[in-house]
């Protein structure tokens, strides 16, 4: 129950919860109190509009549907009509739900907001398109369309009587001339998106989202003076503000709805445990305020009545909570009378016998028990069966012993499989079926669309784990990234290249022969793929249980610079390219050839059939070829790939002395312990071949030939929550979920009752290989667990990469996923890794494939009980001392020159890096250009700060283009990174990484400011125990993070970074700041000192563009740990 005292002395009280849900959950998209009549309007995300009577216990007045394909984005009541805005249409309807008019335009594509200009018949409409539309509903035409600037849109529109105000998705508010919509001024309010804003007089208030690696809502209300377009002091809120509106009054009174996006500690994730509230206060005086809490889920709509008696708050679960400040509240001071439907006409009690205006049908009559004149006679209502036609003698009957056989007259029809005898009437001619086309096969039926489980769907980006209130997402399910209960290390898919490459990294790490090769290799070659895998594999042990996922940007760059192109071909082509490039590079570094099969290659001329030459070759990746094959098992395809070599092209025959194509055949001398099978996913007949084979071989329980390809198990997030929650009385029969989903229990269900005989798979789990005189014979022994043939070698399916599509017949492949077999003890269980979602599957579900959404790109078979003991090679310390100045100045490095000078274990070093902004089209599909940060300079000093361990500038490659050198913040200019003009020590990114990994391997402790930002851009993975980040140490609670320049000035009393940043200076002062931190903490003055610092901040705005104090970082110190635990006790 909400209770708060208002300025009239009354109390706000909870009036009623309004549920707009019927059979499905509908999000409340907008609410509006009618300013003309006593009505309350609700719009939903499914295109439905409902009106209620607030003064009559919120009984329903009318309800109608305005769109079947879009939600209701805006409600604008006028005197006679109610206007509703959907994605592509503005519809006018009477308050009783009768359609009057609708307006559509080619300019209306993704509409989001509308504003009725007071005193006129004009609407201004905007949305996610770059246009503003003026529409006159009296003239029923579009009077003006204003083209906005590039990347500018209008998702919120307001009017203050003088100017029009719009907000876009980039955090800007535009002040526009109401006559011609020209921009007068632009206010940069928030870094990412404006959630809500309002204007009254010359004041503007906003609330929104800032971008700090992850999107975070600003926990304050920003205020602007429109006379000077100047930002005033912001107003702090207890939680994250969602809506901010002016309440018209003599003073500037503000009403704010706030809410936290996280559940309260100790509570389950039900719909009502997101703390929220409404706060009303005077803008110039926070003392005169009223506040009350709300029990609700995520808030999606807000409004108050014209006389401020009612406040309504809607949420994403379809519930509207209404509050009032008095016992008899009204919607408006002077409302028009609402038109109600006429009451039903009751039958007259009596009327005159000569009254011709009355009808006898209006007189109700009782049901008579006596027979009526209209009753059918009894003899006409008896059940009579049709007499069977007498049997006729058949001329084409053959008798065998006691059986009689006759030709099926429906042999060429759809009923040929049904035991149906046609019924012929005497007057009809009996036509026997022709047998001319009896041998032809039936045309294949088109495959139906199938729903893809969310276990396999492409995961949304983790830039914002709270669903945006105003977004275009069609998936309203709240996803979670805490499903990694199997403790696998996951990786982030920041670009298209990472999306595909991460799946192969998981497979390579799971196969011990490949993992052993990778961990034994280290070199100084630029863009070495195996080195990048080595760096990732060494960091896996320290990242187990980290749900944030590892970054693999350096691996993506290495793949792009080794010839992998995403500009054409889509996911299938990219997957095949990356598989071949990575496996080829790993095999190149393997001197022993432990993952290669050995062959004798024979070339024979197709003209004279003469044998040309014989040579020994090796192959580490078998590519399937589908060209001349119509139907074959997977074992037969693998045999073909083993024995048929690559096309050698036309060469001169030694016997017939003519240019001729050579037929290549191979004899197997030795099979590799690991068979890596490339399914050749980018070939033309790939999808057609697999669909044809699956229709013959693939089965699952409950299916037949026409429906053999069934559905996959649904994920818990696909189940809808019951609106009654744990209080539901019909939990046993209710089809909805009650309370928190037990994800481990859901995974256990996927592993139960799976060994059914109806399963059949095209991909065998075990194959037996027999080698005799160079010929390999493969057999599927999946169903023979006791198979024991002395001459056969058993290979077990250990890993797979599958391409996942959208489930359509004309499939669109979206991304790959990884499937790994678990330990032999529980070998029936598989692990599905879909980006950062990790789940268990049983063997049948893992091997089940479907041509509409799931086909294999890589199959990895490993010899039974074969394992390689992994031994990691230590990175030599000599690699740190390797000198390679790429600049032409001949300058020697400032780095230490002897191993004795390198820091020891647990020794502190100061580290800082400077970045530049670049753009490239190598990492995304279809050549899409992306901008990112790249390291331009990195510096490290010893614990005293006097000796430089290294200070390197990084040379840029030719495949990137610099957008901005960020000289003001990095101190780097164009000449510093050019080999011909640089006066610095210039090296490669690979050399810098080797120096970093030598220090990590030696166990040093890195001290710096916002170190996680540096490690993210460098793409270096460091254990948390080796990191001391002063940006988290010198922070008060959840307050904003402070810059190194400000902390040094306030704590050390020194001034740095006046002209440009110097990474050596920053590294030294980070060490000094950490020493001072230990000194203050030992004296017990840390809390008071931090409170003092936060009271003297020069700029209260956390916007990075307006204050130099903010540091963008993606890591936060957990609340239950001490940030200094990883640091040594003394310096």
Curated annotation (Swiss-Prot):
The organism's place on the tree of life at top rank: Eukaryota
Any one GO molecular function term: nucleic acid binding
Annotated Exonuclease domain residues: 909-1074
Any one GO BP annotation for this protein: nuclear-transcribed mRNA poly(A) tail shortening
Compositional bias (Polar residues): 1104-1115
Pfam families in alphabetical order: PAN2_N, RNase_T, UCH_1
Region of interest called Disordered, as start-end residue ranges on this chain: 1104-1131
GO CC entries: P-body; PAN complex
Domain USP, chain residue ranges per copy: 489-864
Protein's UniProt name: PolyA-specific ribonuclease subunit panl-2
């Amino acid at each position: 129950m909400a209770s708060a005292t208002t300025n009239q002395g009354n109390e706000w009280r909870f009036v009623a919860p309004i549920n707009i849900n019927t059979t499905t959950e509908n999000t409340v998209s907008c609410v509006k109190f009618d300013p003309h009549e006593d009505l309350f309007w609700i719009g939903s995300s499914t295109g439905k509009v409902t009106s209620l009577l607030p003064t009559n216990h919120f009984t329903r007045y009318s309800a109608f549907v305005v769109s079947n394909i879009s939600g209701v984005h805006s409600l604008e009541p006028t005197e006679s009509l109610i206007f509703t805005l959907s994605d592509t249409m503005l519809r006018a309807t009477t308050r009783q739900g009768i359609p009057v008019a609708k307006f559509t335009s080619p300019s209306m594509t993704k509409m989001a907001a509308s504003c009725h200009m007071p005193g006129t018949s004009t609407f201004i409409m905007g949305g996610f398109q770059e246009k503003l539309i003026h529409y006159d509903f009296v003239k029923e035409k579009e009077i003006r369309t204003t083209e906005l600037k590039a990347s500018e849109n209008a998702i919120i529109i307001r009017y203050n009587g003088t100017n029009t105000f719009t907000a876009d998705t980039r955090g800007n508010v535009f002040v526009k001339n109401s006559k011609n919509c020209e921009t007068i001024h632009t206010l940069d309010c928030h870094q990412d998106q404006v959630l809500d804003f309002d204007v009254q007089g010359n004041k503007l208030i906003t609330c929104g989202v800032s971008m700090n690696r992850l999107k975070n809502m600003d926990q304050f209300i920003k205020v602007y003076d429109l006379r000077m377009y100047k930002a005033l002091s912001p107003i702090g809120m207890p939680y994250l503000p969602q809506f901010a509106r002016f309440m018209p009054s003599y003073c500037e009174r503000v009403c704010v709805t706030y809410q936290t996006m996280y559940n309260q500690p100790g509570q389950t994730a039900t719909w009502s445990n997101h703390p929220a509230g409404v706060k009303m206060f005077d803008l110039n005086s926070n003392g005169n305020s009223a506040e009350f809490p709300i029990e609700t889920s995520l808030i999606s709509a807000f409004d108050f009545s014209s006389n401020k008696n009612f406040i309504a708050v809607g949420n994403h679960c379809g519930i509207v909570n209404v509050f009032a400040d008095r016992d008899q509240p009204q919607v408006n001071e002077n409302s028009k009378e609402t038109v109600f439907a006429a009451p039903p006409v009751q039958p007259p009690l009596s009327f005159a016998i000569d009254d011709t205006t009355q009808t006898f049908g209006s007189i109700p009559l009782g049901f008579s028990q006596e027979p009526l004149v209209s009753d059918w006679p009894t003899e006409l209502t008896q059940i009579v069966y049709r007499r069977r036609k007498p049997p006729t003698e058949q001329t084409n009957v053959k008798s065998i012993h006691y059986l009689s056989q006759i030709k099926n007259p429906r042999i060429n029809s759809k009923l040929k499989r049904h035991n149906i005898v046609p019924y012929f009437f005497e007057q009809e001619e009996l036509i026997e079926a022709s047998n001319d086309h009896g041998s032809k096969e039936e045309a294949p039926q088109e495959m139906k669309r199938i729903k893809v489980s969310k276990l396999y769907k492409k995961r949304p980006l983790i830039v914002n784990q709270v669903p945006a209130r105003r977004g275009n997402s069609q998936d309203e399910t709240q996803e979670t990234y805490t499903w990694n209960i199997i403790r696998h290390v996951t990786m982030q898919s920041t670009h298209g290249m990472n999306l595909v490459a991460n799946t192969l990294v998981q497979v390579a790490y799971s196969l011990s022969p490949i993992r052993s090769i990778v961990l034994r290799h280290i070199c100084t070659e630029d863009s070495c793929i195996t080195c990048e895998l080595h760096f990732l594999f060494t960091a896996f042990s320290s990242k187990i249980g980290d749900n944030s996922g590892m970054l693999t940007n350096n691996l993506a760059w290495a793949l792009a610079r080794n010839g992998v192109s995403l500009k054409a071909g889509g996911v299938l082509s990219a997957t095949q390219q990356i598989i071949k490039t990575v496996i080829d590079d790993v095999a190149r570094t393997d001197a022993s050839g432990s993952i290669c099969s050995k062959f004798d290659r024979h070339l024979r001329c197709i003209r004279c059939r003469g044998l040309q030459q014989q040579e020994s070759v090796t192959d580490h990746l078998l590519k399937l070829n589908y060209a001349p094959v119509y139907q074959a098992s997977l074992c037969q395809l693998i045999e073909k790939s083993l024995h048929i070599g690559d096309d050698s092209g036309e060469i001169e025959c030694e016997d017939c002395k003519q240019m001729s194509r050579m037929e290549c055949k191979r004899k197997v001398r030795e099979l590799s312990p690991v068979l890596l099978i490339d399914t050749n996913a980018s070939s033309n007949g790939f999808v057609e071949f697999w669909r044809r084979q699956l229709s013959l071989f693939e089965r699952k329980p409950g299916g037949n030939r026409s429906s053999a390809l069934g559905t996959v198990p649904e994920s818990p997030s696909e189940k809808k929550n019951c609106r009654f929650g744990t209080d539901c009385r019909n939990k046993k029969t209710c089809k909805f979920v009650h309370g928190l989903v037990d994800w481990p229990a859901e995974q256990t269900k996927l592993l139960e009752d799976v060994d059914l005989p109806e399963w059949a798979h095209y991909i065998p789990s075990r194959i037996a290989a027999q080698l005799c005189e160079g010929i390999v014979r493969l057999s599927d022994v999946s169903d023979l667990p006791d198979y024991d043939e002395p001459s056969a070698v058993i290979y077990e399916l250990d890993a797979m990469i599958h391409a996942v599509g959208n489930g359509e017949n004309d499939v669109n492949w979206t991304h790959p996923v990884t499937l790994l077999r678990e330990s032999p003890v529980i070998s029936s269980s598989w692990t599905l890794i879909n980006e950062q979602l990790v789940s268990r599957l049983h063997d049948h579900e893992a091997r089940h494939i479907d041509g509409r959404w799931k086909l294999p790109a890589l199959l990895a078979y490993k010899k039974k009980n074969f394992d390689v003991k992994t031994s990691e090679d230590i990175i030599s310390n000599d690699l740190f001392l390797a000198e390679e100045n790429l600049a032409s100045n001949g300058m020697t490095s400032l780095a230490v020159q002897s191993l004795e000078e390198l820091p020891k274990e647990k020794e502190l070093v100061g580290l800082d890096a400077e970045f530049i902004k670049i753009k490239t089209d190598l990492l995304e599909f279809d050549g899409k250009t992306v901008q990112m940060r790249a390291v331009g300079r990195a510096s490290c000093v010893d614990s005293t700060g006097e000796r430089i361990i290294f200070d390197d500038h990084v040379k840029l490659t030719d495949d990137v283009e610099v957008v901005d050198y960020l000289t003001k913040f990095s101190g780097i200019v164009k000449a510093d990174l050019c080999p011909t003009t640089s006066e610095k020590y210039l090296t490669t990114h690979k050399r810098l990484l080797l120096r970093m990994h030598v220090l990590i391997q030696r166990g040093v402790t890195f001290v710096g400011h916002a170190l996680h930002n540096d490690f993210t851009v460098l793409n270096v993975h460091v254990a948390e125990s080796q990191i001391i980040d002063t940006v988290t140490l010198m922070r008060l609670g959840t307050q904003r993070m402070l810059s190194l320049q400000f902390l040094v000035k306030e704590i050390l009393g020194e001034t740095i970074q006046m002209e440009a940043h110097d990474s050596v200076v920053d590294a030294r002062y980070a060490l000094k700041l950490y020493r001072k931190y230990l000194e203050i903490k030992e004296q017990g003055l840390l809390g008071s000192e931090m409170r003092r610092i936060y009271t003297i901040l020069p700029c209260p705005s956390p916007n990075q563009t307006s204050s130099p104090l903010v540091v963008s970082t993606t890591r936060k110190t957990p609340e239950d740990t001490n940030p200094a635990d990883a640091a040594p006790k003394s310096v």
